[in-house]
């Protein structure tokens, strides 16, 4: 049995400025669209390929994150955090100091009564001081690792009620740069991954969708 989440989070009536929130503990942190959601809530049976390669399905580290919702007419949020670095995408922090850090920004809002959107950009960086093994091989990477993510989601509800009918278009793009060594062989390279999916909800009980994901990786020693 593994504990996935155990955290504390400030509420709007906490003695913080309006729009400011703090979250600390172990959680699925802000990174792209899917990471904050549990897998049982996903539209498909498994996570897209970049999530499985870069995040081992999800970034679930220990740390603290602060977010600020800007006082605008549309949804706008910025934030960042410090983390132990014991989970993917870093996986290999020494545990004595923050081994990973993040910053992010996202915007969104209603286009009209039936349509809405959200866009986001995210950065996670850290040092694999303890070494990180790949999900499907025994190569160990030590060095600096940075992950960049952008995401978007568009929703259209023909009736104005997303519980009845909804068409969604969603995608995320990943780029990971590694500068260090693989089993003492010097390596500096960037890999890429992305996915695109569309799901149509016919009614409250039935929906269907399509998804495509792809990876582009450099040669690894």
Model region roles, listed by residue range:
Residues 91-93, 137-138:
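Active-site rim elements
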Residues 114-220:
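Detector for outer-membrane/organellar transmembrane beta-barrel domains
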Residues 1-88, 95-102, 106-113, 197-213, ...:
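Outer membrane beta-barrel
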């Amino acid at each position: 049995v593994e504990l996935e989440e155990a955290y504390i989070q400030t509420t709007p009536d906490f003695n913080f400025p309006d729009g400011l929130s703090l979250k600390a503990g172990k959680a699925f942190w802000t990174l792209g669209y899917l990471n904050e959601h549990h897998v049982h809530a996903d539209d498909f049976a498994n996570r897209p390929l970049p999530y499985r390669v870069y995040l081992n399905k999800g970034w679930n580290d220990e740390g603290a994150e602060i977010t600020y919702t800007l006082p605008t007419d549309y949804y706008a949020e910025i934030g960042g955090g410090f983390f132990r670095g014991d989970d993917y995408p870093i996986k290999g922090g020494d545990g004595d100091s923050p081994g990973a850090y993040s910053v992010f920004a996202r915007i969104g809002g209603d286009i009209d009564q039936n349509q809405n959107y959200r866009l986001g950009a995210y950065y996670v960086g850290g040092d694999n001081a303890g070494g990180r093994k790949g999900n499907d091989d025994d190569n160990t990477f030590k060095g600096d690792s940075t992950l960049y993510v952008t995401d978007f989601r568009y929703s259209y509800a023909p009736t104005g009620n997303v519980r009845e009918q909804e068409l969604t278009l969603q995608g995320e793009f990943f780029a990971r740069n590694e500068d260090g060594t693989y089993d003492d062989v010097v390596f500096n390279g960037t890999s890429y991954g992305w996915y695109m999916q569309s799901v149509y909800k016919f009614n409250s009980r039935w929906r269907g969708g399509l998804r495509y994901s792809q990876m582009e990786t450099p040669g690894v020693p």
